[in-house]
Amino acid sequence: FVTSIAACLDGSVEIDGDLSLRKRDLSPLTSALRELGCGVSSDCLPYIVSGPIIPGSFWIDESFSSQTLSGIILASPGFSGEVKISLRGEAVSRWYRGLTIETSGLSGWTGGYGETMILDSWVVETPERVVIPGEVSLCPISLLFDNLHGTNSLDHCQFGESSITDAIEEAKSGGYSHVSLRDASDIIAPLAALMSMGKGGVIVGASHARGKESDRIMSTIRMLSSFGIEIEENNEGLTIPGGQSPNQPKGPIDCEDDHRLAMTAAVLATKVGGELSGHEICEVTHPG
């Protein structure tokens, strides 16, 4: 989001991030900004963004991430003229996109979502109150802990209904689960661990999880394998045999600069022990 906002400025801004962000392919966003007349020195952080955005048109493949569209919408108050966006692909992470559209609407944006969107400058009017939902994507971490220790650490009803809670409920159904993470790929690691200890199942709709802080399909396989839990890659996600239990790893667990992988490994280690390498990345989610 910062990159899109910086691109509206008449000048150059250098943007950098931690190791996990430096590993991410940001080409969907950087390519879009170049189509709008900006200079972007690289497709990965660190890079220099030289604006401003000029009126024009481009397209976004929504099957990769919701973040490119969200960033452009949030930056649009700084536009100097109309920008036309054509949307392609099967959209993922639609809940987060919807949150962007809802909060922008509360702040004065009069546009809406569609296959073709026209964005122009608008005046931000700060609302008196905006309710930000709780970070429900951390719920499976709590559920995993409870499953391992027989506790009830969190009132899961407080999160209401969402694509993430739907996926969690399917995984908890008590049978062989078929879970789509089209809109909830962030929870793939803890959910796979939970399913492996239950009846098992398949996770689908998670191809875009490969573009996170790590390739979360393969990194989840590697991490769980270290705990003696065996799962397999499929075309869209993971195939997970049930009836498994974690064992103490024989060596350090590489958290791969991925905070969600590190949190899942840490919870498993509370039951069987283990040494984590790079667990400090958890501060991305929980500073301090």
What positions do the PLM features span?
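Short, structured segments at the rim of ligand-binding sites
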Residues: 1-288
